[in-house]
Design a protein with these regions (language model features):
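Short, well-structured N-terminal submotif of metal-dependent ribonuclease cores
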Residues: 1-43, 55-68, 141-142
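Acidic, PIN/NYN-like endoribonuclease modules and their adjacent C-terminal/linker elements
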Residues: 1-3, 96, 108-142
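A general alpha-helix detector
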Residues: 10-11, 47-51, 69-72, 89-90
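Phosphate- and divalent-cation-binding pockets in alpha/beta enzyme and binding domains
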Residues: 23, 47, 89, 127-128
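Short loop->beta-strand "edge-of-pocket" segments that line small-molecule binding or catalytic clefts
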Residues: 35-39, 74, 117
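Short, conserved alpha-helical segments within structured domains
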Residues: 41-45, 65, 86-89, 107
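Short glycine/serine- and small hydrophobic-enriched flexible loop segments
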Residues: 50-57, 113
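Active-site neighborhoods of divalent-metal-dependent phosphate/nucleic-acid chemistry enzymes
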Residues: 77-121
Length: 142
C-alpha cells in the first residue's frame, strides 16, 4: 500500500480548529479513499501531544477540547517508522538545507527513506528545502 509521511502540523491541523483544518480533513479523506497509509517518525508521538498540551496551557483550546483531540490522535492509527537511523540522515539534511531545527529534518528523512511525499503545514520548511516531494498543506489538495 502507498504511504505518505505527515508531520505534527498536519495532524494538529486536523485535530483543532486551524486555518488549515479543511485541507487536513480533505487530505485524510483522500488518503482513506485511496488506501494511503499515513506514517511519521517516532517523534510525531511526542510532538503532537506536546502541541496539544501547549494549546490547552495557553488557552487556545479548553482542557476538554485538548483531551478530546488527544484521544482522537491516539485513535488515528498513524503508523510509526521503525527505522533507527533517521537521526543520521536528518543531520545530513539539516546541513545540506541549512536548517537549524533537526526535528523538521527527521520528518524529511523518514519520507525520503520510504520514497514518499512529506506533507507539512510549515511553509517555511517547504520553501527552504525546495524538494518536489515535500508538500505544503495549504496547497490545493482536493
Amino acid at each position: 500500500m502507498p504511504q505518505v509521511c505527515v508531520d505534527a502540523s498536519v495532524v494538529v491541523a486536523r485535530l483543532i480548529f486551524d486555518e488549515q483544518r479543511q485541507n487536513a480533513e480533505a487530505l485524510w479523506t483522500r488518503w482513506q479513499r485511496e488506501q494511503v497509509i499515513p506514517f511519521g517518525p517516532p517523534l510525531l508521538y511526542a510532538e503532537v501531544p506536546s502541541v496539544l498540551r501547549q494549546a490547552v496551557f495557553l488557552g487556545r483550546i479548553t482542557l476538554e477540547e485538548g483531551e478530546l483531540a488527544f484521544g482522537i490522535f491516539c485513535d488515528m492509527g498513524i503508523a510509526v517508522s521503525e527505522r533507527t537511523d533517521l537521526h543520521l540522515a536528518a543531520w545530513e539534511m539539516a546541513r545540506v538545507h541549512n536548517q537549524r531545527r533537526l526535528y523538521d529534518c527527521i520528518y524529511l528523512a523518514a519520507a525520503q527513506a520510504e520514497g514518499c511525499d512529506l506533507w507539512t503545514g510549515d511553509r517555511r520548511l517547504v520553501n527552504a528545502v525546495n524538494l518536489p516531494w515535500v508538500r505544503w498543506l495549504g496547497q490545493e489538495v482536493v
